[in-house]
Regions:
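Local cysteine-cluster metal-coordination motifs and their immediate loop/turn environment
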Residues: 14-27
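C-terminal scaffold of the Radical SAM
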Residues: 3-8, 27-56, 61-269
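Conserved N-terminal Rossmann-fold NAD(P)-binding element of oxidoreductases
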Residues: 11
Length: 269
């Protein structure tokens, strides 16, 4: 009998402190306090509906990975994240080596909060750094500064997570090749097990789409990618997807399940 593919779960948290001008995800700037308990309750109802729809028995399939994305999931308290994961596990068992990733904004993270997320079951944090240059962060609408980004990476090292990722963008408005590579050097110096190195793209229904900034031309973009790829390779990172680089053994299992045509459920709005 053929074994079923891995099963993963994506959980969406739609709130942010403010909407970034390049973001085309379903995310919304906070206008009042997040209704945490009500939203977690709704997520569980959403999961129950999927379980019934697909006929998933509690011990029939075990979850291989969970990814909590957004939005800014780190706006949700560790206690509510823990309650959410407990309710999920009551319904679908977890593999012993399950990867549970949560996205975090450096501007919403404190030392105790990282540790509390780990205690509640988070095994991997994805930190949305995007750039270490203050002017670029401002252009991107980010709420954090370079110091907060560096601090978040150091905290992730210190709390004993299985892994963590830094999100870094290149091809930013008016960015030179040197600036892009300096950003990458700073990220590599922080020695994350995983680096997601994305080129900025302008998507419909974003502020950047309605008011396009000046981006590097194709020649500069190629130089950034070519030289940056060499830097990452020399630093021991292996490219395993278009924008994903990791140290050996630290690939994002959730992403790999997508690329390998595994099964997944998605809940949230």
């Amino acid at each position: 009998m053929l074994k079923p593919p891995h099963l993963s779960l994506y959980i969406h948290i739609p709130w942010c402190v403010q909407k970034c001008p390049y973001c085309d995800f379903n995310s919304h700037a906070l206008k009042s306090k997040i209704p945490e308990q009500l939203y977690i309750d709704a997520l569980i109802e959403d999961l129950d509906t999927d379980i019934k729809k697909y006929g998933l028995a509690q011990d029939e399939r075990a979850l291989h990975s969970i990814f909590i994305g957004g939005g800014t999931p780190s706006l949700i308290s560790p206690e509510q994240i823990g309650r959410l994961l407990n309710e999920v596990e009551k319904r679908i068992s977890f593999k012993s080596d399950i990867e549970i990733t949560m996205e975090a904004n450096p501007g919403t993270i404190e030392a105790t909060r990282f540790e509390q997320y780990r205690q509640q079951g988070i095994t991997r944090i994805s930190i949305g750094v995007q750039s270490f240059e203050q002017e670029k962060l401002k252009r991107l609408g980010r709420i954090h500064g370079s110091k907060e980004a560096i601090n978040a990476a150091n905290l992730a090292h210190s709390v004993g997570l299985n892994s963590f990722n830094l999100d870094l963008m290149h091809g930013l408005p008016d960015q030179t090749v040197e600036q892009a590579l300096n950003d990458l050097d700073k990220a590599i110096e922080l020695n994350p097990p995983h680096l997601s190195w994305y080129q900025l793209t302008i998507e419909p229904n974003t502020l950047f789409y309605s008011k396009p900034p000046t981006l590097p031309d194709d020649d500069k973009l190629w130089d950034i990618f070519d030289l940056g790829h060499k830097k990452l390779t020399q630093a021991g990172y292996v490219q395993y997807e278009i924008s994903g680089y990791s140290k050996p053994g630290f690939q994002c299992q959730h992403n790999l399940n997508y690329w390998r045509f595994g099964d997944y459920l998605g809940i949230g709005c």
